[in-house]
């Protein structure tokens, strides 16, 4: 299930739960909860689960939660699941930062043994003081997935790095 949202103005978002293993398609990771209104970090997205069977497809990673408006880092995206006989799951997106804070890193794409690797998730962006999140690495497969792009840095910060192909 999805992580719950932060329940006050100073509370961080709760992480999303991991997806359950599937006989064909793995369960998707839950989204990370958003932080409280003003202050707090976004919750991390849950990991996608393994997809089993001859054509198993990995579950997608959950997206990272958004930080509070003023202070806080974005949540990291969850990793995509392994596709046992099929495609790997996509990595989750990194969450957006507050005015002060770093963007969340994107999740790595899952590997697929019988099909395409999962795409890495894009890093979350920063606004004022903070660096963009790094993009998730691509999953291996036939063909490999696409690497996630780094998030935009704040006015006083650097852009995140792209994931590895």
Regions found by a protein language model. Give the residues of each.
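Glycine-centric low-complexity repeats
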Residues: 1-165
């Amino acid at each position: 299930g999805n992580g719950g949202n932060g329940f006050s103005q100073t509370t961080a978002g709760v992480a999303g739960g991991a997806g359950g293993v599937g006989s064909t398609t793995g369960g998707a990771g839950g989204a990370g909860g958003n932080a409280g209104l003003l202050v707090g970090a976004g919750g991390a997205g849950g990991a996608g689960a393994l997809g089993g069977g001859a054509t198993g497809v990995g579950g997608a990673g959950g997206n990272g939660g958004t930080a509070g408006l003023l202070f806080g880092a974005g949540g990291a995206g969850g990793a995509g699941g392994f596709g046992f006989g099929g495609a790997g799951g996509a990595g989750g997106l990194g969450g957006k930062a507050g005015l002060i804070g770093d963007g969340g890193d994107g999740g790595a794409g899952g590997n697929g043994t019988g099909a395409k690797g999962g795409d890495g998730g894009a890093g979350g962006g920063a606004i004022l003081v903070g660096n963009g999140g790094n993009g998730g690495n691509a999953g291996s497969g036939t063909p490999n997935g696409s690497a996630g792009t780094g998030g935009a840095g704040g006015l006083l910060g650097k852009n995140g790095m792209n994931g590895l192909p």
